[in-house]
Amino acid sequence: MQTAPREYSTSGPTAVLAPTTNTQHYAPYSLYRFLSSHKLDLLLGIALLVFLYVITAAPKEVCQVVITGESVVIRNCQQPDRILANLNLSPWNGVKFPLL
């Protein structure tokens, strides 16, 4: 960004440099200029917001199917009867999980 040259007046007994009234005033930065000049800051801010969301998000309960030699346990599932009906349990071919 170019700045206008400043003019100083040196008249008077003390010869103090003071800006004259001929200086140009520039419009404030636009949002686009601000964001384009602060890309790293913007990226770090977004990363911080995503990190905070991941940390504070409530954990979602996962549907679990535990099959042991003794039993089949279905936990936290909305339709356990549908899952149990689709499991192909038989001693001669092992356990097969269908794609639901």
Swiss-Prot record:
Side Cytoplasmic, residues: 60-100
Family matches, as InterPro entries: TGBp3 (IPR003411)
Additional notes on this entry: TGBp1, TGBp2 and TGBp3 seem to act together for cell-to-cell propagation. TGBp1 is the main movement protein that physically cross the plasmodesma with the viral genome. TGBp2 and TGBp3 would facilitate TGBp1 function.
Organism: Narcissus mosaic virus
Residue intervals passing through the bilayer: 42-59
Name of this chain's protein: Movement protein TGBp3
Topological domain ranges for the Lumenal compartment: 1-41
Record-stated family: Belongs to the Tymovirales TGBp3 protein family.
Keywords, comma-separated and alphabetical: Host endoplasmic reticulum, Host membrane, Membrane, Transmembrane, Transmembrane helix, Transport, Viral movement protein
Cellular localisation: Host endoplasmic reticulum membrane
Species lineage: Viruses, Riboviria, Orthornavirae, Kitrinoviricota, Alsuviricetes
